[in-house]
Regions:
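Gly-rich Lys/Arg/Thr-decorated short loops/hinges at beta-loop-alpha junctions or inter-strand turns
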Residues: 50-61, 85, 110-119, 189, ...
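Cofactor-/ligand-binding subdomain signature composed of acidic, glycine-rich
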Residues: 2-83, 234, 288-326
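N-terminal small/polar loop signature for handling phosphorylated ligands or for N-terminal nucleophile
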Residues: 68-181, 186-188, 337, 341, ...
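Functional cores that coordinate and move charged inorganic groups
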Residues: 139-144, 150, 155-298, 302-308, ...
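Short glycine-cluster motifs
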Residues: 386-401
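Acidic, two-metal ion nucleic-acid-processing modules in DNA metabolism proteins
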Residues: 104, 109, 114, 248-345, ...
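Flexible, glycine/threonine-enriched loop-and-boundary segments that flank and lead into catalytic domains
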Residues: 348-374
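Divalent metal-coordination and catalytic microenvironments
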Residues: 39, 92-94, 146, 172, ...
């Protein structure tokens, strides 16, 4: 389907992998060539690699002491615990930050009663380590602060903490600047001088490595860390880090924990999201659980999220869960409203820029949802997007990019105009003085225009392989499910099937009939119908209902509904066929 700008998605069929490798793997594993091709494209070429891909093992986790500064960090935590020094676990207000704080706080509480946590207020303090937070720590006698999912750029703040006699250990996964903060230890796999084998951990993942290292050094059995993995999988899924290597292993066991024996707070969230334990997937976290936990920090306070995730009884978990669910409903209506206003600004010419980038500003918008609105505008206009609002006298906002374009670099090129900025290649935050706004818009627009290519501005659907419906057998699907957990870098494969049509049961579903449920057939199997769902594609309904043939690209998902599990195609895009056969 078209985006608002009428940009049609370009379908790109990936080159097949080396046929010799595919043939060898297919024979060794006794699997379909299509599946062997998918595996080789994901770097799985040998029987051994296939074993560790299909059967993730906790033995595949890296030694946490390979991370720079880990030994110092562990010793400093040990000193705090043995001398009964007060430890403050400090983290960002989003899902990654609040799960990280909950994980490290829960662990430390087992060995010390002198532990507390602190989540900065999104509106009053903003992102990252704040002077207010350090003052609070100082006033309350804390000697050690452990920062999670933030701190890699907090040079002045760490110096300020030192003047109050407070040591800082930083656990972060954001991109560092040239000079690291003068902390006791800086744990960040993205450090230039770090040789840790995997650099795409979530913030919570870095916190977990600290806890794992502490346990390893002081004889605490790894089994006691397993109950923390439900928090970790929530961060890995919601923060959209790559689902490869160590992350995939941790997510695999985290999902197991989440489904079989989750903590009370996550159980409450699943129930409020109308999800059933035993069947939760990464998608459920990304689309249902993650946004709810995030809503606490967007609408009220991130502290609520930590209270939920560390709740020890059902009553507390349900009570806080319901409060957070209300926050999420408020967030939804506000983000709908602001998205509508932003779309209108772009269309009526009152945006700051609609050239190389989409840049919109409204001082009254809610700071908590600008990131979501930026993502919606990328969907609509498919170009790098910055959504700005006003907070505490500064202009502040969120930036989101399109595939292949490094927006962080573009923001960094305007560093002299900014009070602060941070983030990743595709998603970042920034703050500037109002007087610098016009120059910032002009400069970043020019920078983006000079770097971005037409290819990057065309939305693409990457297709893994062509498939005929007859190939989708129970065995094929059973093996495909073992590719999970899916996420960036290990996506649910996208298949292309040509010349299909609806078997006659096609109907519109959803509020306002914007989605379609279809029962598809292809010409080779006219009596074998495969159920499919197409979100936001009702524009094709009349064409399909008239019996016309079309091509689809889709992924195959398991649809769990009222005790029944069925296979379903989730359609990503539809193309009408010109020629009628």
């Amino acid at each position: 389907p078209l985006s608002i700008m009428g940009k049609e998605r370009k379908w790109i069929l990936k080159e097949p992998a080396d046929p010799e490798k595919v043939g060898r793997l297919s024979a060794e594993l006794g699997i379909d060539r299509v599946l062997a091709d998918l595996l080789v494209k994901r770097g799985v070429e040998t029987f051994e690699q296939a074993r560790s891909f299909f059967r993730p093992s906790l033995n595949d986790l890296h030694d946490p002491f390979l991370m720079k500064d880990m030994d110092v960090a562990v010793e400093r935590v040990r000193k705090a615990i043995t001398t009964e020094e007060k430890i403050l676990v400090y983290g960002d207000y989003d899902v990654d930050g609040t799960t990280a704080v909950s994980l490290v706080y829960s662990f430390l509480r087992r060995y010390s009663s002198k532990v507390d946590f602190y989540i900065p207020d999104r509106y009053d303090e903003g992102y990252g380590v704040s002077y207010k937070g350090i003052d609070w720590a100082g006033d309350n006698g804390f000697g050690l602060i452990i920062t999670l999912d933030c701190g890699i750029k907090a040079n002045e703040k760490v110096e300020y903490a030192a003047t109050k006699g407070i040591d800082v250990i930083i656990c972060d996964h954001h991109l560092p600047e040239n000079t690291l903060p003068p902390a006791v230890a800086v744990l960040d796999p993205k450090r230039e001088d770090d040789t840790y084998p995997f650099d795409d951990l979530s913030g919570c993942g870095v916190g977990f490595k600290l806890v794992q290292a502490y346990s390893q050094k002081y004889g605490i059995p790894f089994e006691t860390l397993i109950p923390l993995l439900d928090l970790l999988v929530v961060s890995i899924a919601a923060d959209l880090v790559t689902m490869v290597g160590e992350n995939r292993v941790l997510a695999h066991f985290g999902l197991k924990q989440l489904n079989e024996n989750p903590r009370k707070g996550l159980h409450a969230m699943a129930t409020l999201s109308k999800l059933e334990l035993g069947h939760l997937t990464i998608d459920d976290i990304v689309f249902k659980i993650g946004p709810r936990i995030n809503a606490a920090g967007r609408m009220e306070t991130g502290r609520l999220a930590v209270e939920l995730l560390t709740a020890s009884d059902d009553h507390t978990a349900t009570m806080i869960g319901e409060k957070i669910n209300d926050n999420n409903n408020d967030r939804k209506s506000i983000d709908r409203e602001i998205t509508q206003e932003a779309l209108e600004m772009v269309q009526n010419g009152s945006a700051l820029s609609t050239d190389a980038a989409t840049i919109v500003y409204n001082p009254t918008w809610n700071k908590g949802v600008v990131g979501i609105v930026a993502s919606r505008l990328v969907e609509a206009f498919y170009k790098p997007t910055i959504v700005l609002t006003k907070s505490n006298g500064f202009i502040t906002g969120s930036a989101r990019s399109v595939a292949g374009f490094d927006l962080y670099e573009a923001i960094e090129s305007c560093a002299d105009l900014l009070e602060n900025f941070g983030g990743h290649v595709y998603a970042a935050g920034l703050t500037l003085k109002e007087g610098n706004l016009d120059e910032f818009v002009g400069r970043i627009d020019q920078f983006i225009a000079g770097k971005i290519t037409d290819e990057m501005l065309t939305p693409v659907t990457d297709i893994d392989a062509k498939l005929e419906f007859s190939q989708i057998t129970p065995k094929f699907f059973r093996l495909l499910k073992q590719f999970q957990p899916f996420g960036p870098g290990n996506t649910n494969p996208v298949f292309l099937t040509e010349n299909v049509s609806d078997g006659g049961n096609g109907r519109k579903v959803g509020a306002g009939g914007v989605h379609m449920k279809l029962d598809l057939i292809d010409e080779k199997q006219p009596f074998h119908q495969i159920p499919a769902i197409a979100f936001n594609m009702a524009e094709f309904y009349d064409y399909i209902k008239a019996g016309n043939p079309f091509d689809i690209c889709y992924s195959i998902v398991e649809n769990y509904y009222r005790g029944n599990t069925t296979l379903q195609l989730r359609i990503k895009d539809i193309k009408e066929r010109d020629e009628f056969i």
